[in-house]
Amino acid sequence: MKNKQTPYKSLISGHRTSSKFDSTIYFREVELVDTSPVERFISQRELLTRILGREDDSDEWRTKANLVIIGIVSGVESYFRSIIRRVLISDDDSRAHSYKNKVSYGAVLFHLSHLLPEALLEDCTFVSKETILKNVNNFLGLSINPQQIPALDAALDEFERVCHLRHCIAHRSGLLGSKNAIELGLDKFSTYLEKPISPTLDSVNNVFNICQNLVLEFNDQIFDRIIIRSIPKGIWTGDLRKDKKTFTPLFSIFSPTPNDRDELRKSYRSFTDHFGI
């Protein structure tokens, strides 16, 4: 045997193509359409539905189904980031509550001012009941007890189950792992351990509905609590002509039809009539 040998390399895996990550080819400078976070979520659901198309019994369709499940959960996370950012820009109480939160030096240097609040959320996730409630409280000063709001509590529980499904797709190539099976209910799901997720069109639509229900429930809760929190300030007159400057920005943040003037008037009147303003 020779004293000096070149390192053994079998190349058992076969031929490979040399490739280097070039970040410049993945992004474009585009101007996003200014719309409300809930409207953007609904539009994303519609887009994902079109991408999924008609159900068929093929690996290709099931792969698309898995990918749109990841996409809709991502849409929920994007909703929370966007709504928190928009509220921090517009609502004085929320902004004051977030003064103590930290943002990276790089974000301060390079973020546009209207996007800077979103940099606060870089280390946050919105894939469980605990983290969603914690982040809404930490950044907006809204302490929400879901046990007092059955519809919201149910929406959070269902979404958390969807997130376990998403975890299997994103991190285990669509196979059900033991940890996720335990969270979903091991007695019920033990027979599916290490077996592939096989979604149907109905099951994907069920995931879409669960995600949308959570977004709509939270959208209502955050709007209601912010506007109720403002009442003691005595800023509302009961006359939309006088209150439009304050009410319109809030309506535009939370409404799925932010440019609908009839809905604006209806929402304002519902608020003032309820509180006798």
Give the residues covered by each predicted segment.
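Charged alpha-helical initiation segments
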Residues: 1-74, 78-85
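Helix-loop junctions and short alpha-helical segments
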Residues: 55-165
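Histidine-centered, metal-coordinating catalytic motifs and their short helical/loop contexts
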Residues: 155-183
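A generic secondary-structure signal for well-formed alpha-helical elements
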Residues: 76-83, 87, 91, 173, ...
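Charged, amphipathic alpha-helical oligomerization/scaffolding segments
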Residues: 47, 71, 161-168, 206, ...
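Polyanionic, low-complexity intrinsically disordered segments
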Residues: 1-31, 36, 175-277
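Generic alpha-helical secondary structure signal
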Residues: 39, 153, 157, 202-205
